């Protein structure tokens, strides 16, 4: 006989002697306060019901449970009883055995829920993990205490401090789950529960288990991982807190460890790093929302792409499409250039095979999706045509005339320009409404960011279709407006300019790189420039020189270095020296050039403190970001953060430049800019938006909310 109660976010059903509790809180069954309350209530009912001998907990929709509701972080709702950790204890203390039926992504509090149960059955497609460190926090509902007891210290440390999930097969090997479902998950879980009853197995509580290994061995293992984290996660607090909590599982009784975990979880949740990582999480999801474009806009299907230009960028773009299963026609003007482009793509794939990231068969399949051609006529059946040729307006004009002539009438026409005016390029065609910018970042097959440049006449369905395409080819798309450098590179310019000025005034390239890397960037500005190639920046600077005001401060250091043929790593020398490798070595030649420039300017070189270096680097880009918002070239300040997180290596645990400004306080940022303005002139004058927000004690985050309401 089956009875049920279907009200609320948890559905209660009796299937004979088995009580089935189904979490029903779409879209991902988070442990919101209503779910916790309902689960606790039905758990008590099932334990008091003499007809119920075992309990199965499952989830409706796409998964068992998506863990904590991130919207409850730092809100009173998170404290509503039972809190998640108390709920897991209630589950474990149940007198009747509980089986968790795991399917879909069962992460964070979802896995902790399953660990609170006595047994676990998983669907073969389930993914299981504790990703909290990726949000700047640690598991706070028993995960750091139960998982090491269940599967051993080494695998638990790996899972918890990395935040990476495992698949169901690996979970079975590790001992996280007891059975993989081969048919219907719920039926198999009920059958498993009946087997437990038949065997009189009873509840199996992880809290009573001992961690494998001696105390001395386990403490040594913890210490080994402490040292590793200093190298693998520099500056990140959450992995360190997580390891400390795991260490407590080794040296403390379960209840003590649980209390200590709760305290470490509280500390991590209140940290700037946690706030920054949560901001990044939501910012990425907001970036796909374009206020004036309806979510039900009819999209143009993109089943085939044409890429014009088989250079490094064009080849990388082609790889992005074929990696996602989209066939590509790769077009070049000469057979030699085409052959070189295909060879470069093959070489990239062979490297992936060599490193175990692809199989030979997968490489062959991806290469088979590329058709090479020297004729524009072959783009005729492509849904999107992306131009990726030399960054010169006359070259673009000629290419777009051909694209306009030979592409299909309803095709999307895109330019990969990083600096040129997309509005001008659109007018090279007879259908400017079909033209937009798709600014990929190099290497395009690796970098996640795609700036989607909306020109004045670009139609809404074109923008929406390319935003959807970005997701399909595993990119993070952000819509931006037309200006020199768009959003990311426009902000990069004042940042690099300040780096040059700091060098003229007293710092050395390695001083600036070290400060920026200590802040969290993987590479400082001078090392990045050497890696990218100084000739690229030099070409852009020469183009901009034509319109630069005569009274504007300008550093000729890049000119002088490039005039020596020093273009960075590829020539063995740039800002640094490279002796047969990639290690950047400070070079006396560069020091001489810098000292000569300081002398030429009659500057008395001085010791520049790290704080000043960091403020001049970051505040220059923040101020430019505020001007971009004023100009209407980005929809939200959080979109700017996403651009810098995915295109420029801004440290994720800082949230992005605009969110970092909010953390520092816009009043503090504005006051510092005023000081710099008095010292160095108008380029440092705070933007009107920044000053307005500072004067009203507001933030970029609050400004974003107001834009959404408009």
Please report, for each region that a protein language model flagged, where it lies by residue.
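Short, structured segments at the rim of ligand-binding sites
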Residues: 109
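Short, low-complexity disordered leader/linker segments with a strong preference
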Residues: 1-2
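Small cofactor-carrier domains centered on a conserved lysine used for covalent cofactor attachment
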Residues: 130
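N-terminal glycine-rich phosphate-binding loop for ADP-containing cofactors
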Residues: 5-10, 24, 76, 80-84, ...
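Extended, loop-rich substrate-binding clefts of extracytoplasmic carbohydrate-active enzymes
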Residues: 13
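Short alpha-helical segment that forms part of, or immediately flanks, the ligand-binding pocket
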Residues: 112
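A structural preference for short, pocket-lining loop segments at secondary-structure junctions
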Residues: 16-24, 34-76, 89-103, 123-127, ...
